[in-house]
Amino acid sequence: SYENTDDLAETARDADELRIFYHIKNQVKYIDGSYEKYTTKFLKPDIAELKFGKISSKAYTGKVLKPAVIVKDGKKKLVNGTDYTVTYNNNKNIGTAAITITGIGEYRGTKTLKFKIVPPKTTLTSKTGKTSGGWNRATLSWKKSAGADGYQIYYSENGGNFKKLTTVSSGKLSRSVRYTTGDTEQFKVRPYKKVNGKTYFGAWSNIITLN
């Protein structure tokens, strides 16, 4: 404890960073000459008030996923096991996973972060041909995405914005489309899965261009 507040002020001026985790004993002198002692308590920093790195969505693998956590107190990067501990929940299946960060050492409190586990990205291929009516035809095929309920197919005409063409079930891994010679049509697909009323989309596949 500091008995001399001048010493404390001088220390604060000289230091780049001053952290006090102890009780400071002080006393107040009243007009009648009596004194009353009191203690000021300085708390450790609450880890929930620090900065955390963003955790992006992770592709489902069938195994537990433990993305790294980044915690910063100003410019200082905290150390797992020294400044905080980490526990993971619901971090295996497609859905929303939780990370609980608990302050230790010079830090207190907890912070919960969340990240999505989504169906893995698929790969799109095409095989071209002709219809009986003379139209150009292509069969779009893609690899199965583990855990997906189905797939969304989007298309773009002549460089325009992508629009949804159709949605197919998980049991179907191809789609026949028609296109016009001279036009440029592009296609892409992404898997999805519904969990507790919420839809989780995987990343887009590569883009197939037909012209």
Locate the predicted segments by residue.
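Recognizes extended acidic, P/S/T-rich segments that occur
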Residues: 152-182
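Interdomain boundary/hinge segments at the C-termini of tandem beta-sandwich modules
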Residues: 38-44, 115-119, 209-211
